A protein has these predicted regions:
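Conserved pre-ATP/AMP-binding loop-to-beta segment of ANL
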Residues: 19-22, 136, 155-178, 185, ...
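Conserved AMP-binding/adenylate-forming core of the ANL superfamily
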Residues: 23-77, 94-99, 147-154, 193
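Conserved AMP-binding A3 loop
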Residues: 34-38, 174-200
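Structural core segment of the AMP-binding/adenylate-forming
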Residues: 54, 77, 81-150
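A short helix-loop-beta submotif of the ANL/AMP-binding
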Residues: 61, 67-87, 91-95, 103-109, ...
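Conserved ATP-dependent adenylate/AMP-binding module captured primarily in the ANL superfamily
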Residues: 91-123, 199-216, 246-260, 326-327
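ANL superfamily adenylate-forming
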Residues: 116-170, 275-323
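Conserved AMP-binding/adenylation subdomain of ANL enzymes
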Residues: 197-214, 221-321, 331
Length: 338
């Protein structure tokens, strides 16, 4: 059972129980740069103050269209702390989808990651009457930087944010996540703090990670699956490393050596197909050992196996599976897929 009621309590739980100097780690100019739990929470608090100064009220909608980056998570917590609702947007959808979602949700503030997305929102901004502010995580010549939110905080004090936080209930709406709209206009899925935290609670035990674990994040955090896992990782004190891009996942896995990462089933299928293709190229005793190990793996279950099976599994891990694990950084204990 979790000991928090709202999503913004999750990083505070980490600070109290597992303060982490490497809460989030981002590769910048070839160097992995961390942010600590304390600094993360301070950044979120300053943004919350700025949002209040901009007139954001409980229940207002703030949108974000961005790749995975620590600023996304800071904004997420900052928005929740003032009782507002985050509307995450995929960075690769059309202008017409942006227009529909921003209007449907009644978004007042939108934060994007780069010039391409700033241009998309700018093109349709006149058709979104509720949209008051547009900011960018990147420094752009024609769009205010998101640090302006904090800069506008004026005389807003921390106790004002804390009062907002106290007013938020577990059953309050935390986010509206829109479907892809492949069969019509996108549809908003309304999720409360309790909705998401119940999933976190259900997934904690199966994930073999703790405060000493490193995870790699590359699935879009705007999707509820990866976002839920971020809250889970934060709750148990993991270090979350962001992959540079989908093209660098292999390199980043070897650099970070994660204990856990999440992936979609199709990606795992591709990895499995490559492994099986390599096995088919073997001959003699090596090929026989390979397929024997595959048979052992297919009989695997987390509980209920005999001591004899555990001996076979230990041999298979030493002779065969250790090489597969090494290709995934050497420390992988689980790949979360759903």
């Amino acid at each position: 059972m979790l000991t928090v009621d709202c999503l913004f309590d999750v990083p505070r739980h980490q600070l109290k129980n597992y303060p982490n100097a490497n809460m989030f780690v981002t590769k910048t100019a070839g160097i992995w740069v961390p942010i600590s739990t304390a600094d993360f929470l301070d950044a979120a608090m300053q943004v919350s103050k700025g949002l209040i100064a901009l007139g954001v009220k409980a229940g207002d909608r703030v949108a974000v269209a961005s790749n995975n980056r620590v600023e996304w998570n800071v904004l997420d917590i900052a928005v929740q702390q003032v009782g507002a609702i985050l509307v995450p947007l995929y960075p690769n959808i059309s202008e017409s989808d942006y227009r529909f979602i921003l209007n449907d949700a009644g978004v007042e503030i939108c934060v994007v990651s780069n010039q391409e997305l700033a241009d998309k929102i700018t093109h349709i901004r006149a058709e979104v009457p509720t949209l008051k502010y547009l900011f960018s995580f990147d420094q752009l010549p024609n769009c205010p930087h998101w640090s302006d939110i904090e800069a506008n905080k004026g005389s807003v004090e921390q106790h004002e944010v804390e009062e907002r936080m106290k007013a938020v209930k577990a059953t309050d709406l935390a986010t509206i996540i829109y479907t892809s709209g492949t069969t019509g206009n996108p549809k908003g899925v309304m999720l409360s703090h309790a909705n998401i935290l119940s999933t976190v609670a259900a997934c904690i035990d199966p994930i073999p990670a703790d405060k000493n674990s490193k995870v790699l994040s590359f699935l879009p955090v705007c999707h509820i699956y990866e976002r839920m896992l971020h809250y889970l990782y934060m709750y148990i004190g993991c270090s979350i490393h962001f992959a540079e891009s989908m093209d660098t996942i292999g390199d980043n896995i070897r650099e970070v050596k994660p204990d856990v990462f999440s992936a979609v089933p199709r990606l795992i299928e591709k990895v499995f197909d490559k492994i099986m293709a390599k096995g088919e190229e073997l001959s003699g005793i090596k090929k026989a050992l390979f397929y024997w190990a595959v048979d052992v793996a297919e009989a695997y279950d987390v509980v209920g196996k005999s001591p004899f099976y555990k001996v076979k599994l230990g041999i298979a891990r030493k002779l065969i599976f250790s090489k597969w694990q090494e290709a995934l950084g050497g420390n992988v204990k689980a790949i979360a897929s759903g």
